[in-house]
């Protein structure tokens, strides 16, 4: 999907083989995006643009947008969700810090209620095949295999990606998921 959304947000999605960075190692990271406050579609588009501006990084795939039922705190507006693949030279901790900075600075996100409403939520799902259990970072995302609103868009762009802890493909986790979440492709 090269050029996808480029006119709307100023970011192009190039084929991975066309990427060229000034560093030795690129890693494919998968990032979930979610919004249920304000203009949800515009928030996702803006977030893709902001992530696409990260140094040593390029958005190489973007799923469709999905309208999804809230999980946890259910008395809130439905979410729009998507997943993108980012080819990056940033290490996982730096990438996560940059994602949190986008939430805070570009979207003025204030965390008041866990799983509550938000203008944008950016979660680092996978960072290559890395398994990281740090004080400030856990990769793969600990609830990745439990969430249809993440697995469905992930499977759209990377059905064969392997979860480094389970050894299973994303599409296998989606097929095995027993969830009552509503996930509708827009």
Please give the residue ranges for each predicted region.
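Short, positively charged and aromatic/hydrophobic N-terminal segments
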Residues: 12, 21-22
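Flexible, gly/pro- and Lys/Arg-enriched active-site loops
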Residues: 63, 71-78, 90-97, 101-186
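Extreme N-terminal starter segment of soluble prokaryotic enzymes
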Residues: 26-30
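Aromatic (phenylalanine/tyrosine) cluster motif
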Residues: 4-5, 21
